[in-house]
Amino acid sequence: MSSASYLTVKALTKYIKRKFDADPHLREVYVKGELSNVKIHQSGHIYFTLKDDGARIAATMFKAAATKLAFEPKEGMQVFIRGDVNVYEGYGTYQLYVQEMQPDGIGSLFVAFNQLKEQLQKEGLFKLDWKQSIPKFPEKIGVLTSTTGAAIRDICTTLKRRYPLAEILIYPTLVQGAQAAPNIVQNIQRANQDATCQVLIVGRGGGSIEDLWAFNEEIVARAIFESRIPIISAVGHETDTTIADYVSDLRAPTPTAAAEMAVPDQMELFQRVLSQKSQIHQMVRSQLMAERQRLNKLQQSYPLSMPERLYRPFTERLAQLESGLQTAMQVDLMKKSAQLQQLHSTVAQHSPKKALAFHQRELEARMQQLTRAATYYVAKQQQQFEATIRTLEALNPLSILTRGFTVAYKDQHMIKSSTEVQEQDYLTLAFHDGKVVAEVKDILPKNEGESL
């Protein structure tokens, strides 16, 4: 038989390994069995045998997966395992590489956990692209946990110690039992409606997987994902991992750690401020020293050591301009003086004094004429006035009283006819020097041709 028909052990082992790698049914398997020959290496890896009544298989759990265990694997423990089967080429044996392991008794919960995790992961709820950043200096922090557990005490104590400027708003929340998941969802939605907090801490203290199961519910995961406020999950201990941890914006191993992640340390901030202050002072001192050296160098430079040379050309130019200005002012003054003299001569030739004297004399003559005319007019008017007075006096009916006539009045009305009176009437007779009251005794009619 030709030697070409024989495979080497290495080639055969590699071929078998490729078969294992290509089989999709061996990439992720769920197996239950009993732990045997458990060895926890100082490197953190765990080596053991998984067996049942009919078979056994070697298994390895590397440190990265082993650190997530919530329990310590022990001899004879019944467990549920998720992992993949592959060939260890060095010994030509196949073995189970364990990714997750849970103790028996919670098998249904473990399966439900993995199914929901796979579903939400496919939907993209775990992607980093959706994670919101935690604010560096939150003013208000919402805490969703039980008010009777140790978690609330640890969170509040840590927040007040590290960053007392932040206000803590507590949303009392059920964290265990059938009503826990709906209550967690309700308080997350309430905190979003209030819109007063910049970050939320959602969690509780440690416990069994049944105790923590509310944080593995789908409604809680979706409420965390839909929250507009960044959420820090703080469920159980460091080895406990829930669906809420995968969906939240930041996962904290413990409630105390969540508080530390939510706020800065005031002492660190203070030290940072002092350090930056010192750096600024040092920078200012260095800058001042550099500027002082630059100033000294400039002061010792040639132009500044003899500054008169800098402005000497300007001084000479200024002297020239000053001399030219004085000359120009003298020439201009002479021109203005000549113009003034010429103007004075012109004014003298056309002096208004003669015209004023002529008009003065004419004005005086006119005044005399007006005076004479006014005197004549007044005298003439006086004569006319006196003639009018005499005429009025002659026509005045009262003036006849001085010649012996009287005027008779009855009831203050002047009597013009004898028909206006009756016998026994009383009449008032007005004389030029007084009045007389008389009684009518008889009325005598006037005969024709008879004079008074």
Curated annotation (Swiss-Prot):
Question: Which InterPro entries does the entry mention?
Answer: Exonuc_VII_L, Exonuc_VII_lsu_C, OB-fold_nuc-bd_dom
| Location in or out of the cell | Cytoplasm
Q: Name one GO cellular component term.
A: cytoplasm
Q: Which domain of life is it from?
A: Bacteria
Molecular functions (GO terms): exodeoxyribonuclease VII activity; nucleic acid binding
Which biological process terms from the Gene Ontology are attached to this UniProt entry? Answer: DNA catabolic process
One Pfam family assigned to this protein is Exonuc_VII_L
- Main localization of the protein described in the UniProt heading: cytoplasm
Per the record's keyword annotation, is Cytoplasm included, yes or no? yes
Looking at the UniProt entry, the stretches that span the membrane are: none
Keywords, sorted A to Z: Cytoplasm, Exonuclease, Hydrolase, Nuclease
Which reaction does this chain catalyze?
Answer: Exonucleolytic cleavage in either 5'- to 3'- or 3'- to 5'-direction to yield nucleoside 5'-phosphates
Q: Under which EC number(s) is this enzyme classified?
A: 3.1.11.6
HAMAP family linked to this entry:
Exonuc_7_L
Record text on subunit structure and interactions: Heterooligomer composed of large and small subunits.
The entry assigns this protein to a family as follows: Belongs to the XseA family.
Q: What does this protein do?
A: Bidirectionally degrades single-stranded DNA into large acid-insoluble oligonucleotides, which are then degraded further into small acid-soluble oligonucleotides.
Name by which UniProt lists this protein:
Exodeoxyribonuclease 7 large subunit
Originating gene? xseA
